[in-house]
Amino acid sequence: YDHWIARDLAAYLFLAENRDSDASLLRIVNKPKRYISKDLLAEAEQMPYGLLRSLHVCPSLQKWQAEHLESLEEDLRQIQKRKPYEALRYVRKVVGYDEYLSDYAVYRKASLSNMIEIADEITETAKGTESGTEFVRKMEELSRQMKEQSKQKGNTHGVTLTTFHGAKGLEFGAVFLPSLAEGIIPYEKGRKGSALEEERRLFYVGLTRTKDRLFLSFTENRYEKPLKPSRFLMEMGLDERLFFKENRRKF
């Protein structure tokens, strides 16, 4: 919950409720790209207003930059109308944060599926919260709890929630790999060439973290859309005949 993706998503919600939060604006102003330059931001910081308001009245503000700012303002209004879970989905799918992650992954040669996995986890965390402020507090509390748990010594019993990247070098008695469906692993944007190979390597990392037991599962639906089992399951020699359904539950 201290990951920069979590902080980005929280910043959108916090800014929607607190337009004077300069720190939140600076964090997301170009995520996705809005072409608000460092020079323009420096100019706005010299004005006696909040940063967002100041940007609108900067003498050097170009028309196309103003249009991006107006679009951001409208997005913030839409975010403010929604509860955190729906607001984060809006940020990711409508504002374009997931597309920003896709561009970032290409630029940094990073795993897009890992970043989407983190964004999905943060989005799920928002369920049950009523405001951006409550969501931010919930993340802060979860982060505090995880740090406290990591400090505890001598307790060998527990559950570790981690990403494929975070699991490298670790070993567990039992490993659960959920959501092994096309569009999740591999992620829909990373299905070709080196990106696909990177996702396959990460999947192998997950498989090999176990000493005794390995549990693989997939979800039939996501955001009300049907899904198919991951191709990586098929590559292991598994096929859909091994998935049985009884009373709408997978076994």
Regions found by a protein language model. Name each.
Residues 20, 114-117, 172, 198-200, ...:
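A generic structural signal for residues located within well-ordered alpha-helices
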Residues 34, 46, 93, 208-209:
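Solvent-exposed polar/charged
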Residues 134-187, 198, 202-222:
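Conserved helicase core region in the C-terminal RecA-like lobe
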Residues 190-194:
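Short glycine-enriched, charge-decorated loop/helix-capping segments at active-site entrances
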Residues 221-251:
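Helicase C-terminal subdomain and adjacent C-terminal extension
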